[in-house]
């Protein structure tokens, strides 16, 4: 059975892991890193760059660089680059495709299946978009699991005692808090809450806003209008945030940040940890609301939590750790790597699916209530939030008017009392209802949530047996035809990438052969046969001319044409050197053998 890999598709960084020898291990990417920046760049020549190489060129190419695309999953947001439009699913698929390729290189075998993690508070549309991204990248997404749940798996797989844990997951762009009960291999989520628009990026933005304001005060120049300067500020802000986790003061020094009529301007500011915490105090407080909500939903007091797991790079900030410490009255657990534990948990779930990991049961929940719009614009819940999934629930409704021939089922997700305040997941019609006074027809509406948190809704007229159903893909979901088109484009790009890499290798080999040939000629020209020298020089010239053009087949041909003369030339040189090293007749060769026996005996004394 082929391997199923675990992927943490993050807002700022992504990570992948796999089960090896009964243990989940993080797989390094092609550059040797254990995490991959979730950044996609498009070079001026049209080449797609993903990961660290895309992040490195972002300063000089901000218009063609895409970051934090995860924040737009499940929306109709489009990225426009050089006249082309890309959906968040397509950009995410490019990141997943790189991870798939790197995993294949690490494992030495094809990777076609994956478990991908999402924030616990992701809506149905966002989950479906993640699944679509996997499909576009050529991966069969075997399971979508929640990030806090994955982190709990990574922490609790080898724990035997029963315990209640809280996962505090503050990533690059999203925040989740989940409460789980662990015991006898069962991981049961009791409650989850969160904020899909809160993460490390927001802390970076506060530093950026502060730098822009300070620089404007000093120089009168507004850097927010300069895209290249803003990209430099973004990198500097992230670096400052990271540094302030270990030092109390950091220097932000960006020479030649901009210029005016007087000449170039340099940016040099000091940011203290105290000032940073002042700038971000409200963001810290925003994490406490969902934390209180999850505790309330689980019916627990802070003292009943045995362990608090910190997940996501942003939890390294001292102010975050202090807020958690203050709320729960105890130190958070720091025994897991906040950047890698989610991918490790995804790999463990993959191991459960393949049978490599036994005696583990994962019981997750739906983060938001699901229901339909009823008379008066009211939101009627059919499945309450924090219900264990998979699950199915039914409720019977009736018509609102006499002789109503059809009903529109407006499917919603959220917690507000009125339909307008919640997110629309989809609409569909049940038609062919026989004429009858209002209140007589019986319409059974069934909600079915699978293990991935994907919703199916059906409506059935109990009188006629007629039914209609819909798999919710969200108003921004992609059709099968769109996904197929994107899959083909992704495959085509992968093929183009393979060809481009092959061309680079052919050119590199040809360059190396030219260098080797010219070096050999330079060292041995004087001792060589003039005809061989001439033949080799001509072959070198032909290959150099081929390298100036773009005809790869010609380069391959001329490389082969140079290999023969070079081998013949070096073989002749080797043979000549071997002959020169053989011993010739020495100076005593003509002497009589008897001369060697004419030894003179003599005494000597030491003086």
Curated annotation (Swiss-Prot):
Induction record: By stress conditions e.g. heat shock.
Gene Ontology MF terms in the entry: ATP binding; ATP-dependent protein folding chaperone; unfolded protein binding
Protein name: Chaperone protein DnaK
Family designation: Belongs to the heat shock protein 70 family.
Residue stretches in coiled coil: none
PANTHER family: HEAT SHOCK PROTEIN 70KDA
Keyword Transmembrane helix attributed: no
PTM annotation (Phosphothreonine): residues: 174
Keyword field contains Chaperone: yes
Classification via NCBIfam families: PRK00290.1, prok_dnaK
Region (Disordered) residue spans: 571-607
Amino acid composition bias (Basic and acidic residues), ranges on this chain: 589-607
Keywords from the UniProt entry: ATP-binding, Chaperone, Nucleotide-binding, Phosphoprotein, Stress response
InterPro entries to which the protein is assigned, alphabetical: ATPase_NBD, Chaperone_DnaK, Heat_shock_70_CS, HSP70_C_sf, HSP70_peptide-bd_sf, Hsp_70_fam
CDD domains from the UniProt entry: ASKHA_NBD_HSP70_DnaK-like
Cited function: Acts as a chaperone.
Pfam families in the record: HSP70
């Amino acid at each position: 059975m082929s391997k199923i890999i675990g992927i943490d598709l993050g807002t700022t960084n992504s990570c992948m892991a796999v089960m090896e020898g009964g243990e989940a291990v993080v797989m390094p990417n092609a550059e040797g890193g254990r995490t991959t920046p979730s950044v996609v760049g498009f070079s001026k020549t049209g080449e797609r760059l993903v990961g660290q190489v895309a992040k490195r060129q972002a300063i000089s190419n901000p218009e063609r660089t895409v970051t934090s695309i995860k924040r737009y999953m499940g929306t109709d947001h489009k990225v426009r680059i050089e006249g082309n439009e890309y959906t968040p699913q397509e950009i995410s698929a490019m990141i997943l495709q790189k991870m798939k390729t790197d995993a294949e290189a690490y494992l030495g075998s094809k990777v076609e299946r994956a478990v991908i993690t999402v924030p616990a508070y992701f809506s149905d549309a966002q989950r479906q978009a993640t699944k679509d991204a996997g499909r576009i990248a050529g991966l069969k997404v075997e399971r979508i699991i929640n990030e806090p749940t994955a982190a709990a798996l990574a922490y609790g797989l080898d724990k035997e005692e029963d315990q209640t844990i809280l996962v505090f997951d503050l990533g690059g762009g999203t925040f989740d808090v989940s409460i789980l009960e662990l015991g006898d291999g069962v991981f049961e989520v009791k409650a989850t809450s969160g904020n899909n628009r809160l993460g490390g990026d927001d802390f970076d933005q506060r530093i950026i806003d502060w730098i822009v304001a300070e620089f404007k005060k000093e120089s009168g120049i507004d850097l927010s209008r300069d895209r290249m300067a803003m990209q430099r500020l973004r990198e500097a802000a992230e670096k400052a945030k990271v540094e302030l986790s270990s030092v109390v003061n950091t220097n932000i020094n960006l020479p030649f940040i901009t210029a005016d009529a007087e000449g170039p301007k340099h940016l040099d500011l000091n940011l203290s940890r105290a000032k940073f915490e002042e700038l971000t105090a409200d963001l810290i407080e925003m994490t406490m609301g969902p934390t209180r909500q999850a505790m309330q939903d689980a019916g627990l007091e802070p003292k009943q939590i045995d362990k608090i797991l910190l997940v996501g790079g942003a939890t390294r900030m001292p102010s975050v750790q202090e807020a958690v410490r203050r709320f729960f009255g105890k130190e958070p657990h720091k025994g897991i790597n906040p950047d890698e534990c989610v991918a490790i948990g995804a790999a463990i779930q993959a191991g459960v699916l393949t049978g490599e990991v036994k005696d583990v049961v994962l019981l997750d929940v739906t983060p938001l209530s699901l229901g339909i719009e009823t008379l008066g614009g009211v939101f009627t819940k059919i499945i309450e939030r924090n219900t264990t999934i998979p699950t199915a629930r039914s409720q019977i409704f009736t018509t609102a008017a006499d002789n109503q021939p059809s009903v529109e089922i407006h499917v919603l997700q959220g917690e507000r009392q009125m339909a307008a305040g919640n997110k629309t997941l989809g609409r569909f019609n049940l038609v062919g209802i026989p004429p009858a006074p209002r209140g007589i027809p019986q319409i059974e509406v069934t909600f079915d949530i699978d293990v991935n948190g994907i919703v199916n809704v059906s409506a059935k007229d109990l009188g006629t047996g007629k039914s209609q159903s819909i798999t919710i893909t969200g108003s921004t979901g992609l059709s099968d035809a769109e996904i197929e088109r994107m899959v083909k484009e992704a495959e085509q790009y992968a093929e183009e990438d393979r060809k481009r890499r092959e061309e680079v290798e052919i050119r590199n080999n040809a360059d190396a052969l030219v260098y080797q040939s010219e070096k050999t000629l330079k060292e041995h020209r004087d001792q060589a046969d003039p005809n061989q020298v001439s033949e080799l020089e001509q072959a070198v010239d032909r290959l150099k001319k081929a390298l100036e053009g773009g005809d790869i087949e010609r380069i391959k041909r001329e490389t082969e044409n140079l290999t023969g003369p070079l081998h013949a030339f070096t073989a002749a040189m080797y043979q000549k050197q071997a002959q020169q090293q053989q011993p010739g007749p020495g100076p005593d060769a003509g002497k009589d053998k008897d001369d060697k026996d004419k030894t003179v005996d003599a005494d000597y004394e030491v003086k």
